[in-house]
Amino acid sequence: MKGIKAFTLAEVLITLGIIGVVAALTIPSLVQKYKEQATVTRVKKFYSAFSQAYTMAINENGTIDTWGLEDSEIDVDEDGNSGYSDSSLEQYEKFFNIIGKYLQKVEYEPIRNTRGKGFVMSDGTQIIAIWLQPSRCTGNGINHSDTYCGDFYIKTDNKPARKDDGTFNSNVFVFNINPYRIFPRGTDNTEFKDKCLSGTDMSRCTGWLILNENMDYLHCCLLYTSDAADD
């Protein structure tokens, strides 16, 4: 049509360049946000399913302190390496043999970089470690529902569970066990700040993820650490 000018090659290239810059700035952020939300969904799904299974196990078998379990122990081998004792690994398996039948599907198989075996849920979530302390877990009424009976760690992908310095990566989450329920670690404000926000133990971010349904703590750790160093 007369009176309408086409874009010049230079204008087209400039426009494409601007689009490319915007995409380069926004797409990584969108991908990261998507991955974080997928992790949130997986952890919350696990928490819901495992909580229900634990409740059913209690209803049929009594509280965990009556399951005939022994306290977990650490052994040190001749090279000075520490790890769960053989008896502790047996208790680990015994615990999940009881609770596993209340879950849709649990596979018991070797887990990379851990001694012995671990449990893998149907969606690939790995239960990589458990620490049982039934001797501290009395189950004496609902008023004692926060009694510590142990804790366990899950991993949401196949990336390493630990950083080079030995601390947990952000793909690891920890839950406490008490006589009547499980609950996420890191709901205590002091623990959340000292462990999660400082980056010294990312597994203690679990409480934030469950309560707030996001992983925004990943984007404020450096800021918190910097502020703490300035105090």
Language-model segments: residues:
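N-terminal single-pass transmembrane signal-anchor helix
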Residues: 3-35
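Aliphatic-rich helix starts adjacent to a transmembrane/signal segment
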Residues: 29-50, 54
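Alpha-helix exit/C-cap motif
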Residues: 51-70
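Short amphipathic secondary-structure patches
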Residues: 69-118, 122-123
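Low-complexity, acidic interaction segments enriched in glycine
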Residues: 97, 104-179, 184
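Extracellular/mature segments of secreted proteins
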Residues: 145, 203-206, 212-214
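Conserved small/polar residues in nucleotide/adenosyl-binding loops
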Residues: 224-229
